[in-house]
A protein has these predicted regions:
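Extended alpha-helical scaffolding segments used for macromolecular assembly and cargo binding
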Residues: 126-198, 206, 215, 219
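Amphipathic alpha-helical "lid/sensor" segments that cap RecA-like P-loop NTPase cores
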Residues: 2-42, 54-58, 64-68, 79-80
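C-terminal boundary/linker of central alpha/beta nucleotide-binding cores
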Residues: 41-121, 130-133
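Amphipathic alpha-helical segments of tetratricopeptide repeats
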Residues: 149, 169-170, 186-190, 221-233, ...
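Internal alpha-solenoid helical repeat scaffolds
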Residues: 192-367
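Alpha-solenoid helical repeat architecture
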Residues: 146-147, 157-158, 196, 233-243, ...
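Recognition helix of helix-turn-helix DNA-binding domains
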Residues: 586-625
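Linker/hinge segments immediately adjacent to helix-turn-helix/homeobox DNA-binding domains
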Residues: 27-41, 446-468, 472-474, 478-482, ...
């Protein structure tokens, strides 16, 4: 091979050619290839890192802590004034250091990264801590709080950890394992913790989210003691901290709307500023896609709960700068939907969307989306964005919690219409254990997973899970979630021919539903309950439920038919499929643009991308003819 070919192979294989070379070198030296017990990383370090100067080795070791880095970052975290030339030399000589397409960011191949980290662990402990602290400062200054927390934690710099906890207000902190945060607190000196009362408030709320109530109460006592131990603290700041403590403690009365509101009013009376530990851009529903599922706690009290919500939310908004704004409108819209009052639901939904527009509260927008998708199966109105569009939009926000909520809505919708292959993988393959859900929102995820099991025909699984799920709902006063689980279980029993059990469950649900005028939970499960409902006494809302159920199933069938696309179109996104079908129906670009509210230029770009994905070539007439043929197959 020529030198050029060797270099090309090296870069094309992202360095794996070097790994093959190292194996062959072992064969030449020892007469055997490395076996399964050989450490390729030790071989790599011996060949690629140890021959370097100690200064270059230290440079690589420190950069090994970063997933990606720029020249500016490299200089900051290594304190090498010549970092740019060091990187340029490494990139030119080594395929294991790659410049990314943006032209400014670099990345180590994972073999180089692993070996660099091993080398880092050989540096003096104080050097390691200083380097990690520099990483923490770099990430903190750029708002990359998750990375900053890990860096400061690794450096045992708990002032840094607590400072970032305060700035983050628990938003990204929720993505860390609680055990890691508790480990930091165990190693943090009390006097360091007491220097950061606002961080203590954030940690109290995080402990509630993780259901670590004893730790939450212990932090409260430490906070109050720290306030009392500061005679120099102004009365105003004492009031702010004590008021915010009341605000956080209100979560212990979670979903007791009136009880929570009493503490919100106490907080409002003491505070002269909005809460620092709760930010508008943070989550409000603990990952639940539904507000009503969180706060409907007792059959027959729905109207009281709606009135309490209307009364209490303004007090909460006052002390949190509008956190969760629109929640009462969403809850009222959901209640109207469940009562079959579709126009009222649409009006409330439009009001909620208008209230939260451009205020940065993505959690509430996602709750609106959840209601919009459920409504669409009754009204035929298409939500503002399809799931793929919404997912792409959320990806730019780098918040896994928002994607989890979207996935739950996506899963529930496709389970309702019976399109199980379109359900997001985490629900379709039942991998919820791999996702870190906050405790108050987890029962809603379990409910949705149950709906997926039902759609997949896994009836025994639904029945087997029900007792544990209902026990959790009872403990958390989740009356609406329990109603859905009972209906799912009744449907599963009916499908397995266990009519007596199904009937007993359905009779209980009908009694509870009648107390609040709820019909849609039954309608959403009509596919499984139809024979049983027909056999029930035709009184109360049962005839109305049957009528709505028939219409609902007809609309679901229509949605399934519309979404049925040729096999070849499965490589296209949903939007591309829609456009491809319109092109095949011989609509012009202008007509498609008007129908889908796009510009003609956008339609043209979509069409070109469709042809490229489907490998359709030729002039315009030939391409359209081929597309029509594909739809007919």
């Amino acid at each position: 091979m020529s030198d050029h070919q060797v270099e090309q192979l090296l870069h094309t294989t992202e360095g794996w050619f070097s790994a093959a070379y190292l194996s062959l070198q072992t064969l030449a030296e020892r007469g055997t290839l490395p076996d399964g017990g050989s450490d390729i990383y030790t071989m790599f370090s011996a060949a690629m890192i140890q021959p370097l100067s100690l200064r270059r080795q230290a440079f690589l070791a420190m950069l090994g802590l970063a997933d990606e880095f720029t020249e500016e970052m490299a200089q900051a975290v290594t304190e090498y004034a010549d970092a740019a030339s060091q990187i340029a030399d490494l990139t030119a000589r080594n395929a294991f250091v790659t410049r990314l397409p943006d032209g400014v960011t670099y990345r180590f191949h994972h073999m180089m990264k692993e070996c660099a980290q091993r080398t880092f662990r050989t540096l003096p402990p104080e050097s390691q801590q200083r380097c990690r602290r520099r990483y923490g400062q770099w990430y903190e200054e750029r708002g990359q709080y998750l990375q900053a927390l890990r860096a400061y934690g690794g450096a045992e710099d708990f002032d840094g950890v607590l400072r970032v906890v305060e700035k983050d207000a628990g938003i990204l902190l929720a993505l860390l394992p609680p055990e890691q945060v508790l480990s930091w607190l165990d190693r943090c000196l009390p006097e360091v913790l007491e220097r950061h009362p606002l961080a203590m408030l954030v940690l109290m709320r995080s402990m509630f989210n993780w259901r670590r109530i004893p730790e939450m109460l212990r932090l409260k006592e430490q906070l109050l003691a720290a306030i009392d131990a500061r005679p120099d603290m102004s009365g105003e700041e004492r009031g702010n901290l004590r008021g915010e403590c009341d605000l956080i403690m209100s979560f212990l009365l979670y979903n007791d709307i009136a009880g929570m509101s009493r503490l919100h009013r106490s907080a409002s009376a003491q505070m002269s500023r909005p809460a620092v530990s709760i930010r508008r851009q943070g989550g409000w529903t603990f990952g639940s896609p539904s507000v009503l599922m969180m706060f409907h706690r007792q059959a027959g009290r729905l109207d009281c709960e709606l009135a309490e919500m209307d009364e209490c939310m303004p007090h909460y908004y006052c002390v949190t700068n509008g956190h969760g704004q629109g929640a009462e409108h969403i809850m009222r819209g959901e209640a109207a939907f469940l009562r079959g009052q579709l126009d009222d639901a649409r009006i409330a939904l439009a009001g909620a969307y208008a209230q939260i527009r451009d205020n940065g509260q993505e959690n509430m927008a996602l709750c609106c989306d959840h209601l919009a998708w459920r409504l669409s199966l009754c009204t035929g109105e298409t939500p503002r964005q399809d799931f793929d569009q919404r997912r792409r939009e959320l990806l730019f926000q780098h918040n896994a919690a928002w994607l989890n909520i979207l996935n739950s809505t996506d899963a529930y919708y496709h389970a309702l219409i019976g399109e199980t292959e379109s359900i997001p993988e985490v629900f379709r393959e039942h991998r919820l254990a791999s996702v870190r859900y906050l405790a108050p929102g987890k029962p809603m995820m379990e409910l949705i997973e149950n709906q997926v099991y039902l759609a997949q025909g896994a009836y025994a699984e639904v029945i087997g899970r029900s007792q544990q799920l209902l026990a959790v709902c009872d403990a958390m006063h989740y009356a609406l979630v329990a109603m859905h689980v009972q209906l799912q279980t009744a449907g599963a029993c009916e499908m397995l021919g266990r009519r007596a059990e199904a009937r007993g469950l359905l009779e209980q649900v009908l009694q509870d539903a009648a107390a609040d005028g709820l019909v849609m939970p039954v309608v959403e499960n009509y596919r499984y309950l139809a024979p049983l409902l027909a056999d029930m006494p035709q009184r109360g809302d049962v005839p109305h439920m049957i009528e709505l159920g028939r219409r609902y199933e007809a609309r679901c069938a229509s949605v399934r038919q519309r979404s049925a696309v040729p096999m070849a179109f499965h490589v296209l996104t949903p939007r591309e499929r829609d456009i491809a079908m319109l092109v095949a129906a011989r609509l012009s670009n202008r007509e498609i643009a008007e129908k889908l509210y796009l510009s003609e230029g956008s339609v043209k770009q979509y069409v070109n991308r469709i042809y490229a994905k489907l490998f359709i070539e030729g002039d315009t007439r030939t391409k359209r003819k081929r597309l029509v043929e594909m739809t007919q197959h």
